């Protein structure tokens, strides 16, 4: 989501080295432009480079740092209506000797948006596989990370293309079938039944709705200035028609439970990370996955909501690095036996 932007004042005012008047003018008059500058600045600071690659007439946009080496490359898949830059808060705490690749999911940010594109979970899995083959990322198995919708896609990808993936991190993934619905899912079903697609909580159209979405997705209660809320809305509004189409596709009967239907096919070592106070996707999904994936481990984070990467970037990065180290050392031991 957009939670990492809320700390931008300290960053922009203290380290961007922009004249104070220019900063104030941008804040008051063009908050959406300031948000774009924020992401540009952090990519540059963290050494993340943006590139494009094509599969036939389809363009993928991605950022990367480092080069493939003896450690597995890491491919990161963001959630619904986010973009590759949502990982920056976590990238900050990852070792610079890791090869990181963050891709814009189909239709998001710099990746092609086509009315003909299959936005179902299976369709997105196929697109990500095309991206992987374009970069030859699967020349040797890589580590796949996904959060929310991206976790849904990542889990199904690991089931469909097992030889591509050496290990998997699922961060509060969507795609599971619960015995009872939480309040958020109940509300979504009511909206679907009434055909009120304009009121989807994850697609805000006003600063007030943006504030409500941030509260829904985060355990921490940030006090976000009105101008920044407006900027976040301004950035998203041109894409809301696409977001609605995508949302209806991924909650359709074809896609809604794709991870649930494929989780027993996941054979690689799997890390499951979930915020205990997640109001979007119930934390009981972690136990559900652990019971179906033989080689898995669960990490539940206290005082953390759905936006795990934004709320607990340092902790999430440490869990990821520790998990990779344990899997990698185990693989090396097996080779020596």
Swiss-Prot record:
Membrane disposition: Single-pass type II membrane protein
Keyword Lipid metabolism annotated: yes
Pfam family, one: Abhydrolase_1
Signal peptide: none
AB hydrolase-1 domain ranges (all copies): 72-313
EC number: 3.1.1.23
InterPro entries the record matches: AB_hydrolase_1 (IPR000073), AB_hydrolase_fold (IPR029058), AB_hydrolase_sf (IPR050266)
GO annotation (BP), single: phospholipid catabolic process
Stored SUPFAM superfamilies: alpha/beta-Hydrolases (SSF53474)
Active site: 148, 278, 306
Taxonomy, superkingdom: Eukaryota
Key words, A-Z: Endosome, Hydrolase, Lipid metabolism, Lysosome, Membrane, Mitochondrion, Signal-anchor, Transmembrane, Transmembrane helix
GO cellular component annotations of the record: AMPA glutamate receptor complex; GABA-ergic synapse; glutamatergic synapse; late endosome membrane; lysosomal membrane; membrane; mitochondrial membrane; postsynaptic membrane
Gene3D superfamilies recorded: alpha/beta hydrolase
Membrane-traversing stretches: 20-42
GO molecular function: monoacylglycerol lipase activity; phospholipase activity
Record's catalysed reaction(s): Hydrolyzes glycerol monoesters of long-chain fatty acids; 1-octanoylglycerol + H2O = octanoate + glycerol + H(+); 1-decanoylglycerol + H2O = decanoate + glycerol + H(+); 1-dodecanoylglycerol + H2O = dodecanoate + glycerol + H(+)
Coiled-coil boundaries: none
Enzyme class: hydrolase
PANTHER family linked: MONOACYLGLYCEROL LIPASE, MONOACYLGLYCEROL LIPASE ABHD6
Protein family per UniProt: Belongs to the AB hydrolase superfamily.
Its job: Lipase that preferentially hydrolysis medium-chain saturated monoacylglycerols including 2-arachidonoylglycerol. Through 2-arachidonoylglycerol degradation may regulate endocannabinoid signaling pathways. Also has a lysophosphatidyl lipase activity with a preference for lysophosphatidylglycerol among other lysophospholipids. Also able to degrade bis(monoacylglycero)phosphate (BMP) and constitutes the major enzyme for BMP catabolism.
Name listed for the protein in its UniProt record: Monoacylglycerol lipase ABHD6
Taxonomy of the source species: Eukaryota, Metazoa, Chordata, Craniata, Vertebrata
């Amino acid at each position: 989501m957009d939670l990492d932007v809320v700390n931008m004042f300290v960053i922009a005012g203290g380290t961007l080295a922009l004249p104070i008047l220019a900063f104030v003018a941008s804040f008051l008059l063009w908050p959406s432009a300031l948000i774009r500058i924020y992401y540009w600045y952090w990519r540059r600071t963290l050494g993340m480079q943006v590139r494009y690659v094509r599969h036939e007439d389809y363009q993928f946009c991605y950022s990367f740092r480092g080069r493939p080496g003896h450690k597995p490359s890491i491919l990161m898949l963001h959630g619904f209506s986010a973009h590759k830059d949502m990982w920056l808060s976590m990238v900050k705490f990852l070792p610079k000797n890791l090869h990181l690749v963050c891709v814009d999911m189909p239709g998001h940010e710099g990746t092609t948006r086509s009315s003909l594109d299959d936005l179902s979970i299976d369709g997105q899995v196929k697109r990500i596989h095309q991206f992987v083959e374009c970069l030859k990322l699967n020349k040797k198995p890589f580590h796949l990370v996904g959060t929310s919708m991206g976790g849904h896609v990542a889990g199904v990808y690991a089931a469909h293309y097992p030889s591509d993936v050496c290990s998997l991190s699922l961060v509060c993934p969507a795609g599971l079938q619960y015995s009872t619905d939480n309040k958020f899912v109940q509300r979504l079903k009511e909206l679907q039944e009434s055909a009120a697609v304009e009121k989807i909580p994850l697609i805000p159209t006003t600063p007030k709705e943006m504030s409500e979405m941030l509260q829904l997705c985060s355990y921490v209660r940030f006090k976000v200035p009105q101008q920044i809320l407006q900027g976040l809305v301004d950035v998203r509004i041109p894409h809301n028609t696409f977001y609605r189409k995508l949302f209806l596709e991924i909650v359709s009967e074809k896609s809604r439970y794709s991870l649930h239907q494929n989780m027993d096919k996941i054979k690689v070592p799997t890390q499951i990370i979930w915020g205990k106070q997640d109001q979007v996707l119930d934390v009981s999904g972690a136990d559900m996955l652990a019971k179906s994936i033989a080689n898995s481990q669960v990490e539940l984070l206290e005082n953390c909501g759905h936006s795990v990467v934004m709320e607990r970037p340092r902790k999430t990065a440490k869990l990821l690095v520790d998990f990779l180290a344990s899997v990698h050392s185990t693989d090396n031991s097996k080779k020596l036996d």
